[in-house]
């Protein structure tokens, strides 16, 4: 058996990407960090994106923080998802930053959300906070594209949320809007403001917003593919 090592270049095919992701299954984050030559933080309070960065190193991801997918040549986005002992998601999943201005003529088909979710490599990771970060194990990966029904659900929520943004109602949107997709503030601090449209069409400053997949959506997705019990 060949020694496990990070991919130094982006994988040339989905099959190679999935094969590498499958090899990581069962390893702890600490083991993978040591083999990759990086330090494991004590917790994720100041390093929220650390797990994603670690797996990007192992899988040869190319995009970094650019708007394209993590594996641009393959059109695949990488999403790590913390799960409990039953394989259920512990938190919502960030998709992308929401555009709050310049949205005339934008459609679901050409939207950034749909582009990011067209093809996703889901990698579940143990997320129970009672387990030290270095001891949390990586689960089996899943290469996924939305079904017709999932695409319909996402589109309906996206259209509702974008209508509210365009009509100057961004400040009225709460995390309860949307069945499977939600919009909520995404900023490291409350002073990081961005331009948006106000209720009377005037420019306003507000917190940046991000699109997130709700837990019910990702739970159903994982349950269906991994045959988990889905209450």
From Swiss-Prot:
It is found in: Cytoplasm. GO terms for cellular component: cytoplasm. Its main location: cytoplasm. One of its GO terms (molecular function) is endonuclease activity. It comes from the Bacteria. Belongs to the MutH family. This is DNA mismatch repair protein MutH. The gene is mutH.
């Amino acid at each position: 058996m060949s020694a496990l090592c990070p991919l130094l270049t982006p994988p040339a095919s989905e099959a190679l990407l999935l094969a590498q992701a499958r090899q990581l299954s069962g390893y702890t984050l600490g083991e993978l960090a040591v083999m990759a030559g990086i330090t494991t933080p004590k917790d994720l309070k100041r390093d929220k994106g650390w797990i994603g960065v670690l797996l990007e190193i192992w899988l040869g991801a190319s995009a970094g923080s650019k708007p394209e997918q993590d594996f641009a040549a393959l059109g695949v986005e990488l999403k790590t998802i913390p799960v409990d002992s039953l394989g259920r998601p512990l938190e919502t999943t960030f998709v992308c930053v929401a555009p709050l201005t310049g949205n005339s003529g934008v459609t679901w088909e050409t939207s950034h959300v749909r582009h990011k979710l067209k093809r996703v490599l889901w990698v579940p990771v143990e997320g129970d906070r009672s387990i030290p970060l270095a001891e949390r194990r990586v689960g089996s990966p899943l290469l996924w594209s939305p079904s017709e029904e999932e695409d319909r659900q996402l589109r309906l929520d996206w259209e509702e949320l974008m209508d509210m943004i365009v009509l100057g109602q961004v400040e009225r949107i709460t995390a309860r809007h949307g069945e499977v997709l939600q919009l909520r503030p995404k900023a490291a601090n409350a002073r990081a403001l961005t331009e948006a449209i106000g209720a009377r069409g005037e420019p306003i400053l507000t917190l940046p917003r991000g699109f997130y997949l709700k837990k019910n959506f990702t739970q159903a997705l994982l349950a269906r593919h991994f045959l988990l019990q889905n209450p």
